[in-house]
Structures are given as structure tokens and as C-alpha cells.
Amino acid sequence: MAQKVTVTVLAKMKAEGEKITMLTAYDYPFARMVDECGVDMILVGDSLGMVVQGETSTLPVTMDQMVYHTTLVARAAKRAMVVGDMPFMSYQTSVKDAVINAGRFIKEAGAAAVKLEGGAAVADRIKAISQAGIPVQAHIGLTPQSVHQMGGFKVQRQEDRLLEDARIVQEAGAFSVVLEGIPFEIAEKITKTLSISTIGIGAGVHCDGQVLVIHDALGINEGHVPKFVKKYKQIAQIAREGITEYVDEVKSQAFPTKDHSFK
């Protein structure tokens, strides 16, 4: 069995210049495929609000929903590190709430780490969760939970603030940081400055690793996708063809045949 990915393994990968792969998953079948294909980290993202639940943002997602989906993913993952994404208002309210809710991901759902959005503003949460023995992945730049405050999903270009946020989350105890929606030159500077790994999403090739939403990467999401997404397959098209073929065969009585029937 391949070595389980841990914070120590990720630190070694950064030190040796080996790129880190991360994808989202929200259920057992996809998590199993992602894990068996060699992805290093599985993010159970609050993005499930948009790609699974049909919401227009991640804001409505609840802790109970995140714990449920993380449980399914953790059950499937044998090698990959499972990271539970802390949803809106699960950590913003207080340090105590942050630690309690982070603990639910580990104790109830079986995750190995949690992710939360924000830089300096959540440093006390990162520190407290880390001191409770829970690995924390930070997330700076474009932070979807702050979409209203940012005025939409916009590229973040404030270099000094981004560099400062990155430094502060590292000092607070984060083992990694997601860099979302920032110019690649800034992401490169952050990656060279930090000793912890940077995982990019719309942040260029110089990050220590990359993450994508699986529904975007596999073409399951048929709506608008950001510029930074590459669709590696067109699963929605294949699924539609199969569903249409099924409907046609049932209507025409081509299915089921004797091969699919019992005597």
C-alpha cells in the first residue's frame, strides 16, 4: 500500500520540488477514484454548495452538511490526505467555535486536516486549532466566503497584503496555504518566501501544487467555469448521451432484452 500522505510528506514534497496534487470530492465513488489515481490531497470543499446543491455561492453550506460529505470521502481515501473545508460562520464567530467545529471534522468525519479562509484576520483561529492538534490549511487571495465584501469573484492583486497574510498564517501554524485568484508573479513570491506548501487555484504554475474542483476539471459542471480551469474530460456530454440512449431504448422496447431478464 502506498504511503499515507501526511503533513510531513507534504513538507518533504515541497523541499524536494515535487508538485502536490489536490482535487475536491464530495462522495464515496469519486473520492475512491481520486485516491486510487494518486491525487495527494482531497478537499471536501464548501464548493459543494454550488456544484452539488445548486446554490449560487458557498455561503448556505452548513457544518452538518460538511461533516456528512467529509465522512463519505474519508471512508474512501486510503492514501490521500482528506481536508475538510470549514463553512461560512463555522469559525468566524469565535475562537472557541472554530476549535469545536474543526474538531468535528476530525472526530466525527475522519478528516486529517481542515481548511479555512482568511489571512491575518483568522490567525488566532489557525493558532488555536493547530494547538488543539489539528492541521490547518489556510486560504488567501480570492476567498469565496467573502464574496459580498469583495464585490464579486475578482482577482486579488494587493501584493503587500497578500505577502503579509501568507507570512502571518504560516507563523500562526498553518501547514499549507491555498492561493486563489492572484497574479502568478505574486504567487511565485509567496511560494519562495514560505517554508510551507502553497496550493494554487488560479495562481499560476509556480505554486507548490494545484487544486481544482472536480466537477470543473471533468466537465461535469456545464455552466460557466473560471479562466483557470482546464476541462480534462467532458463527463456531462458522455452522461447525457448515455441517458438519452437509455430513454430511447426503453421507449422502443430495445431494453431490457432477454439477457437482462430472469426466467
UniProtKB/Swiss-Prot annotation:
Record-annotated active site: E180
Residues at which Mg(2+) binds: D46, D85, E117
Chemical reaction(s) catalysed: 3-methyl-2-oxobutanoate + (6R)-5,10-methylene-5,6,7,8-tetrahydrofolate + H2O = 2-dehydropantoate + (6S)-5,6,7,8-tetrahydrofolate
Chief site of localization: cytoplasm
EC assignment: 2.1.2.11
GO molecular function annotation: 3-methyl-2-oxobutanoate hydroxymethyltransferase activity; magnesium ion binding
Cofactor note: Binds 1 Mg(2+) ion per subunit.
Pfam families: Pantoate_transf
Enzyme class: transferase
Coiled-coil residue windows: none
Entry GO terms, CC: cytoplasm
Subunit structure as annotated in this protein's UniProt entry: Homodecamer; pentamer of dimers.
Protein name: 3-methyl-2-oxobutanoate hydroxymethyltransferase
